[in-house]
UniProtKB/Swiss-Prot annotation:
Family label: Belongs to the TACO1 family.
Gene Ontology terms for molecular function: DNA binding
HAMAP family, sorted: Transcrip_reg_TACO1
Principal cellular location given in the protein's record: cytoplasm
Source organism: Burkholderia mallei (strain ATCC 23344)
InterPro entries recorded: Integrase-like_N, TACO1_YebC-like_2nd/3rd_dom, TACO1_YebC_N, Transcrip_reg_TACO1-like, Transcrip_reg_TACO1-like_dom3, YebC-like
GO biological process, one term: regulation of DNA-templated transcription
Cellular localisation: Cytoplasm
Keyword Transferase among record annotations: no
Source organism phylogeny: Bacteria, Pseudomonadati, Pseudomonadota, Betaproteobacteria, Burkholderiales
This protein's GO CC annotations: cytosol
Signal peptide, first to last residue: none
Keywords (A to Z) from UniProt: Cytoplasm, DNA-binding, Transcription, Transcription regulation
The protein, known as: Probable transcriptional regulatory protein BMA1884
Amino acid sequence: MAGHSKWANIKHKKAAADAKRGKIWTRLIKEIQVAARLGGGDVNSNPRLRLAVDKAADANMPKDNVKRAIDRGVGGADGANYEEIRYEGYGIGGAAIIVDTLTDNRTRTVAEVRHAFSKFGGNMGTDGSVAFMFDHVGQFLFAPGTSEDALMEAALEAGANDVNTNDDGSIEVLCDWQEFSKVKDALEAAGFKAELAEVTMKPQNEVDFTGEDAVKMQKLLDALENLDDVQEVYTNAVVVEE
């Protein structure tokens, strides 16, 4: 058994995403454009594009929007030339935070990210200052009540590296990030549909925040996630709701 209330955390995350669907779509369109520009418009030969298109489907984005984003990326149209920049920093108590961005203006983005860190009690670090505390992996989360034995057998056969049952009964499956699409397809073919399936930066160790510290940490994370140029925010902080 391992982990905190992963199920509660993911339900909260999904609810927040639903509330910001327009913003989620904007981020996905940027990611689809960049993936298509870098690797071509065929999802079968471009794993990054396929992942972005799958996320768009999960977010109920219309297929026409997806196609237009792919076409813009492949065609190199205005707006497709975003630069990928990763920022690293610390929240209160030294919590590790990674901020991945896609931007057409590096100066604007770094200023906005730095301002969010400083306004809410954190500070930016140098490249590599916290990334070593995370693993780049494919992650799947299955609802409590899923058959652990059957899922473990299917996951390991699919090429997963690890299967963990959390304290709340949810089950987490981890794989190499390069194998994400293959493992996802195999699990779904075996009848297992994950509530969460993503390529992520998973913290090697987590730090709980409660009370006032939890409120402060959540404000910092929200401020970063609400920046237009930010695509993903990863942290080893766990905000515990009381």
